[in-house]
Amino acid sequence: VHGSRGLGDVYKRQGDFIHALMESIHDELDKEIDPMSREGISQYSLRGNLDAAVRVSNACLADQHVIDALSVRLMKPLEDETGWDVFSLEYKLRAPLTTIFSDREMGRYSRAFTFLWKLKRAEYTLCELWKAMKPTVSSRFQREGLGGNIGKALEVEQARCHRVRQSMHALISDVQYYVMFEVLEPSWNEFECKLSHNAANDDLDSIIAGHENYLNSVIEKALLGTKSQVLQRSLQLIFDSVQKFKSHTFKLYEAIEDASRVRKSDQRRIVEREMNQQWGVDFGESKEGEDYLSEDFVTGAKESLDSIENEFQKHVDGFLKLLPLQTHVDTSFLSFRLEATFRQGA
């Protein structure tokens, strides 16, 4: 039963294990994998990163037998998949726990972990984007960066990036809150309460049945059951939009920073020439910094963000339409929060 509790303990917000793990393995998981040879990602390196994440996080306070049972598993990759798509944590069980945790149950735990992992990856991605986009970075670009019409257009695109990131973060946070506080914790508390009340009279069969009911509750309420497959695909499209936004934003900010760096170098040369009584501005240089990024680049960046923003909103609209149809579970509070966030301006 302690293995079941680990699902929530590892995932809960106040824990730092998942964040420490993602910090240490994101470079490895960004690599593409050959579907035939599985080359491109090292399970040995991932295992070392897992051990390091345990040591530097609150996971080190867990019982030693729990830490020893935690391992890394790589699922079979498909075409164009990266390490993020095949990585999974594995809890290796020994008898007599295997009596309760059969291969079927462990497969369902794996499905739940994969979903939670995708949620946490989306949250981690959006937090990393905030570090790249935070106001101090934007103000530095404005102070040292590009002038003229191109500079103004880039400021508009930076502001739009902040708005899109905020919308994505709001949705991911609401879904995480639902999974944590309306699915995992109440399902576990109910299971634990039944075990403690019937501890003296329960036989093995009743424990197995209680655990199966608990797992059924988690799978269904987390929208991972057969009745929620369409909704789950809709949520996966939202996850994909987050990763597309990450790629777009990092490319945009890297280009702006590179242009800013070149401009600063040119500005130093201009000052040196003027001090030596030479022409300050040479061919291809601009004191306003208008020529370091082309209008085509700015137009392309705007069109790319338009596409990502429209795609994300389309997927959110689809998700909101499907959510009330999940009559087998109570998603009313999640629907209310999302409607308040995404429909108030409609």
What do these predicted ranges mean?
Residues A112, H169, Q176-Y178, A199-A346:
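Intrinsically disordered, proline- and charge-rich regulatory regions
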Residues W130-F141, L184-E192, Q236-L237, I256-V271:
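Amphipathic alpha-helical scaffolding segments
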Residues A20-S24, E28, E32, N49, ...:
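Charge-rich, solvent-exposed alpha-helical interaction surfaces
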Residues D9, I100-L129, E155-D203:
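Extended amphipathic alpha-helical scaffold segments
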